[in-house]
Amino acid sequence: MAQISLTFPDGNARDFDAGVTPAEVAASISTSLGKKAISATVNGAHHDLQWPIDADASIAIHTLKDDAQALELIRHDCAHIMARAVQEIWPDVKVTIGPVIENGFYYDFDRAEPFTPEDLGAIEAKMKEIINARDPVRTEVWDRPRAIAHYEANGEPYKVELIEAIPGNEPLRMYWHGDWQDLCRGPHLQHTGQVPADSFKLMSVAGAYWRGDSSRPMLQRIYGVAFQNRDALKKHLHMLEEAAKRDHRKLGREMNLFHMQEEAPGQVFWHPNGWTVYTTLQDYMRRRQRENGYVEVNTPQVVDRKLWEASGHWDKYQENMFIVEVDEEHAREKAINALKPMNCPCHVQVYNQGLKSYRDLPLRMAEFGACNRYEPSGALHGLMRVRGFTQDDAHIFCTEDQIQDETARFIRMLSTIYRDLGFESFDIKFSTRPEVRAGSDAVWDKAEAALEAAIRTVTDDFELDPGEGAFYGPKLDFKLTDAIGREWQLGTFQADFVLPERLDATYIGEDGAKHRPVMLHRAILGSFERFLGILIENFAGKLPFWLAPRQVVVASIISEADDYVREVVAALTRAGIRAEADIRNEKINYKVREHSVGKVPVILAVGRREMEERTVTLRRLGEKQTSVVGLDALVADLAAEATPPDQRPDQPAV
């Protein structure tokens, strides 16, 4: 039999018979590894242990201790085990697909009756039976006629449709455990017992159209989470409990920040408290941008389709745009406009007004641009996923030689802003040229080198994502981790060689000839709406004092103190503090509870003693202890605390 050479991660190589499987390779290394192995990476591709290897290759054997590969297989097998459990309990249920998703898995079922919470408990119990049975997982490759005939005979029309959509040259792999079978690319574990029985949980049921098409049948999607051990599952469930407590929609009601309603899906109704937070944050961003040399512009929200066609967005983005048809007076045909989904084409129009010289560059142009994008109603989620939003958007027009300095400047600015807003660190992902791209290799070489060099002025710890840049330029993505461990992708920085060409942006170089500027797209917060949702949840509503909508409430203990309450509020207001009076005829404990639920950072109680001594009784949000403080000293302290970070004397400029 022909021999092949397999190279292991340590660089050693061994010869095996052609057609050897990873399971046989693992067993040849040690009996222990043969039992612990769950999958293998062969020439960079993840396969199950039954995959035959026919040619020289690199190979790495994985066990349950290999986080990424183990988690993928555990979650994948959980989806299949769940589908088997459902069909063993309800044999008439039809199965469709069940992929791995972040933190877990789901499977879509066609069942006449809705699944109930009690059903989820029964399914979990059946899954544990299947796991404890340790049924071996086996696989076969079938031809299309055999696979279609099998699923037609078993009344599984969704599987037949899936097979018919698979390219004819792609093998059809069938996986079994016990008597249950599914069509799947794999890979899978060696037996069902390799799934830890105490590390998964079924979470919820939701509706989902087959193939995401609202004209197709509505299915029932069961979601589950799965991890490598019980402790990881408990940690995740605790995080979900914390997330529920911090839900910005719940806190938004309690703090009277905003609401949303059916008549304007995906659009935010900002209340006075919420709008105060919004404008305070926007004012802060405006100052930070100004000190970094940005000019601020404002561009139209309704723009003729001609501009979107010229920019390329009409072809690529039309389904996400709100289209407006207008009967223009004396026009032969209707004017077709769109609400702008992004600001960049409009910024090029501003740039193009007047001749630009290389001496004018870099030109940093910012806008708090109101944008609208169509999102399916099922995808909308409070402030996190909306249709109408405002971006902290900016575009930098520069020469190729200026890319590195502008990138480094941006990263420093972003780092300062994130720190000011309570996020001490962030992660960077650097996405490089895709196979299909615009621009010459020389330009890409220069841009990628500039971005990487700029990153390294801040950190050497970044994630490289080869081939995942946009077709028009390399990009950086910035991720934050919040107080309960969730990651949020927020900031972006992207070089663009295409839009200046499409929209004919030029500058006069030192040689007197016209050149195309590079356009650097950048955002720090993303959208104000989403960022405020993240901020509310990160702080569980207890926003930094300078951002809190109501910074101080002064509450009377007795009605005789009402005038002093007003005097205290006036003194705080003169010092630039957002203060309110509460002189209702209610007990002080009632007032404290109500304003604590509303996340007011400081509550000042005023009674007869405070009035006579010109003091206040101070209570901080979340603290049980109170203290009596002189009014003048307190006003000075709170005024310093209310000062935005960029305006404090100890805060250096970006």
From Swiss-Prot:
Enzyme type, top EC level: ligase
Occurrences of domain TGS (ranges): 1-63
Binding site for Zn(2+): 344, 395, 521
Subcellular location: Cytoplasm
Chief location category: cytoplasm
InterPro entries linked: aa-tRNA-synt_IIb (IPR002314), aa-tRNA-synth_II (IPR006195), aa-tRNA-synth_II/BPL/LPL (IPR045864), Anticodon-bd (IPR004154), Anticodon-bd_dom_sf (IPR036621), Beta-grasp_dom_sf (IPR012675), TGS (IPR004095), TGS-like (IPR012676)
Organism: Dinoroseobacter shibae (strain DSM 16493 / NCIMB 14021 / DFL 12)
Coiled coil: none
GO molecular function: ATP binding; metal ion binding; threonine-tRNA ligase activity; tRNA binding
Keyword Repeat: no
Cofactor note: Binds 1 zinc ion per subunit.
Assembly and binders: Homodimer.
Known catalytic reactions: tRNA(Thr) + L-threonine + ATP = L-threonyl-tRNA(Thr) + AMP + diphosphate + H(+)
SMART domains: tRNA_SAD
GO cellular component: cytoplasm
Record key words, sorted: Aminoacyl-tRNA synthetase, ATP-binding, Cytoplasm, Ligase, Metal-binding, Nucleotide-binding, Protein biosynthesis, RNA-binding, tRNA-binding, Zinc
Similarity-based family: Belongs to the class-II aminoacyl-tRNA synthetase family.
Swiss-Prot/TrEMBL cofactor(s): Zn(2+)
Name of the protein: Threonine--tRNA ligase
Purpose of the protein: Catalyzes the attachment of threonine to tRNA(Thr) in a two-step reaction: L-threonine is first activated by ATP to form Thr-AMP and then transferred to the acceptor end of tRNA(Thr). Also edits incorrectly charged L-seryl-tRNA(Thr).
Gene Ontology BP term (one): threonyl-tRNA aminoacylation
Lineage: superkingdom: Bacteria
